[in-house]
Amino acid sequence: MSKIVFCDFDGTITAVETFAGMLKEFAPDLSAQIMPQMYARTLSLRRGVRQLLESIPSQKYADIIAYAENKPIRPGLAEFLAFLQEQSIPFIIISGGIQGMIETVLKREGLLDKVTAIYGVNLHTQGEYLQVHSDWENETELVAKALIMDKYSGVETIAIGDSVTDITMARKADLVFARDRLIDYLQAENQPYIPWDNFFEIREYLLLRD
């Protein structure tokens, strides 16, 4: 059966929480108030992330993109993407973070053209404050990951993630690689997963399994 890989970005491809870190940098007080509620799942990602982003002045957009420029990625991503290309397995990034930040990091690494598609949040900067736009918004998420996965039917789905934004993606996938907070959420729901630390490990697992 053909496969497809869906991967989070913030804290998954990046070795640090790039989007969450940016929010703490540019909206520190509101982040301290809202982020614990999102992690506890008492406030929806849709409401919380929108509220945080739309509290930031539009003139800060260039600084936001620059914030991502030096953020490190997890080891093995280039090798993992090369492996997927050899196997003709699409690699799709689905992120609740900002599209421009994702593209900035991938361009720096020379990997943007190795990614099949990127789904993230776009920001409009015409007004005084940032305005959020997402084509994949639902009742609880700004970027509804399971909804995007539905576009790609008839294949084995592999999910890679690390946190609260990846729960619906993990529930939907046939095979899940989880780390950090996502492990706790999946354990609480008795959902199966494979722990991972770097992309070399994921490549090795898929090689041995096949």
Swiss-Prot record:
UniProt keyword annotation of Hydrolase present: yes
E.C. no: 3.1.3.87
Xref: Pfam families: HAD
GO molecular function, one term: 2-hydroxy-3-keto-5-methylthiopentenyl-1-phosphate phosphatase activity
Disulfide links within the chain: none
Domain of life of the source: Bacteria
Catalytic activity: 2-hydroxy-5-methylsulfanyl-3-oxopent-1-enyl phosphate + H2O = 1,2-dihydroxy-5-(methylsulfanyl)pent-1-en-3-one + phosphate
Keyword presence, Amino-acid biosynthesis: yes
Pathways involved: Amino-acid biosynthesis; L-methionine biosynthesis via salvage pathway; L-methionine from S-methyl-5-thio-alpha-D-ribose 1-phosphate: step 4/6
Enzyme category, top tier: hydrolase
GO BP term, pick one: L-serine biosynthetic process
One CC-aspect GO term: cytoplasm
Alphabetic keyword roster: Amino-acid biosynthesis, Hydrolase, Methionine biosynthesis
Role this protein plays: Dephosphorylates 2-hydroxy-3-keto-5-methylthiopentenyl-1-phosphate (HK-MTPenyl-1-P) yielding 1,2-dihydroxy-3-keto-5-methylthiopentene (DHK-MTPene).
Family: Belongs to the HAD-like hydrolase superfamily. MtnX family.
PANTHER family in the record: PHOSPHOSERINE PHOSPHATASE, POLYOL PHOSPHATE PHOSPHATASE PYP1
Listed name of the protein: 2-hydroxy-3-keto-5-methylthiopentenyl-1-phosphate phosphatase
Taxonomic lineage from the root: Bacteria, Bacillati, Cyanobacteriota, Cyanophyceae, Oscillatoriophycideae
Gene giving rise to this polypeptide: mtnX
